[in-house]
Amino acid sequence: FGLKSIPVNLLAELKQTFPYAVHIAVGAMYLNIDTIILREFVSNSDIGIYQAGMRAMVAATLGLEILNSVLIPKLSSLVAEKKDQLIKLSTKFNLLTIMGGIVIALIVNIFSNQLIYLVYGEKFLRLSDYVIYFSIIIFLRYFGVIYGALLTISDKQKIRTYGVLFTLLFIIIVDLFVIPTYELYGALYTLIAAHIILNTIYFYFAYKEYRTSFFNIAYVK
């Protein structure tokens, strides 16, 4: 019938895609593991407050998934032969994304009471005590997105996977020590520290690969 068989090395394919699968799986656990630990030390009311903050934070960073889906194919087309264009485009997106993260974090802080009342109602106004910490995490997630994408297109997905695995382990260990004393604040302090560590890993290896910080404002025209 004119069909041709194409040989596929299944083991090689699995080996290549495994880091992506692990990264997705760990990413799903990344923002939920602290809730599991919190359940052992705080009230159901506190859990509700924390989960409301997490849902709002995820909503504030939904644009990152869209950006990744658009940006990674575009940058991948430049990585082999047009490195200068890749650096220029990545720098533009990096600066714009970081500025976007700052703006969103500021809006969340300035209008926190109004947003909480509008979305969750009066019973959740206590969430405003923790908004500053959630907004820091929002900014950190925007800060790291371009560096993470650069590692993916540079065939460094294993580094991303090791990074999230390490920081997940960090969250679990530190949470067990700080949550019994600091409760919700402890979980948020740990999550902020984990994002700083992960962003540092991404930044270091992206800089090592391209020898630029992707902060050159001259590229934004």
Where are these regions (language model features)?
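Helix-loop junctions and terminal segments of transmembrane helices
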Residues: 57-82, 150-153
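Alpha-helical transmembrane segments of polytopic membrane transporters and translocases
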Residues: 18-19, 34-36, 48-64, 96
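Membrane-interface junctions at transmembrane-helix termini in multi-pass inner-membrane proteins
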Residues: 135-165, 206
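Residue-level recognition of pore/gate-forming positions within transmembrane alpha-helices
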Residues: 28, 55-58, 138, 164-169, ...
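Interfacial segments at transmembrane-helix termini and the short loops linking adjacent helices
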Residues: 44, 84, 110-139, 185
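Interfacial transmembrane-helix starts/ends
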Residues: 14, 83-99, 103-111, 128-131
